[in-house]
Amino acid sequence: MGEFSATILAASQAAEEGGGGSNFLIPNGTFFAVLIIFLIVLGVISKWVVPPISKVLAEREAMLAKTAADNRKSAEQVAAAQADYEKEMAEARAQASALRDEARAAGRSVVDEKRAQASGEVAQTLTQADQQLSAQGDQVRSGLESSVDGLSAKLASRILGVDVNSGGTQ
């Protein structure tokens, strides 16, 4: 630290020996030279560097605006497509429901028709069976009636021990 203090002390003595000086509040020629160089660099930057950067930034901003517009348009198209989809699905569901109802009605009519046909066949079969049973009953009745006379005579002959048909005794 001693060396550093010695350097500062030597610099301050050299400034005092130089005759005293310059006031930093009063501009000197160096200030104007630096100011002119700064203005030239500023002009060069504003003339050749800033316009391309501004152009690129403007293009980027336009591209972002276009992308945002495209996104909005796409969102609207998606919403419209979704609405169309829902509409078509509702129509398809309605058509499917109508087709199901028609198929059920057709099925019921076929079932009713087959039931009526089966009922008719059953009635016809019952009528035929009734006729057959009546005919068989008549045949059996006539057969029994014809055999009753012979059987009753035979039974009477057995019980009485006399031949009933011939009128004699056994």
Swiss-Prot record:
Q: Does the keyword Isomerase apply?
A: no
Question: Where does this protein reside within or beyond the cell?
Answer: Cell membrane
Report TM segments. 25-45
Q: Which InterPro entries match?
A: ATP_synth_B-like_membr_sf, ATP_synth_b/b'su_bac/chlpt, ATP_synth_F0_bsu_bac, ATP_synthase_B_chain
Which residues fall in a compositionally biased region of kind Polar residues?
122-139
Q: How does it sit in the membrane?
A: Single-pass membrane protein
User: Origin, by domain of life?
Assistant: Bacteria
What keywords sit in the KW lines?
A: ATP synthesis, Cell membrane, CF(0), Hydrogen ion transport, Ion transport, Membrane, Transmembrane, Transmembrane helix, Transport
Ranges for the region named Disordered are 121-147
Per the record, GO CC terms?
Answer: plasma membrane; proton-transporting ATP synthase complex
Q: Output the Gene Ontology terms for molecular function.
A: proton-transporting ATP synthase activity, rotational mechanism; proton-transporting ATPase activity, rotational mechanism
Function in brief? F(1)F(0) ATP synthase produces ATP from ADP in the presence of a proton or sodium gradient. F-type ATPases consist of two structural domains, F(1) containing the extramembraneous catalytic core and F(0) containing the membrane proton channel, linked together by a central stalk and a peripheral stalk. During catalysis, ATP synthesis in the catalytic domain of F(1) is coupled via a rotary mechanism of the central stalk subunits to proton translocation.
HAMAP family attached here? ATP_synth_b_bprime
> Quaternary structure per UniProt?
F-type ATPases have 2 components, F(1) - the catalytic core - and F(0) - the membrane proton channel. F(1) has five subunits: alpha(3), beta(3), gamma(1), delta(1), epsilon(1). F(0) has three main subunits: a(1), b(2) and c(10-14). The alpha and beta chains form an alternating ring which encloses part of the gamma chain. F(1) is attached to F(0) by a central stalk formed by the gamma and epsilon chains, while a peripheral stalk is formed by the delta and b chains.
Give the family this protein belongs to, as stated in its UniProt record: Belongs to the ATPase B chain family.
Name by which UniProt lists this protein: ATP synthase subunit b
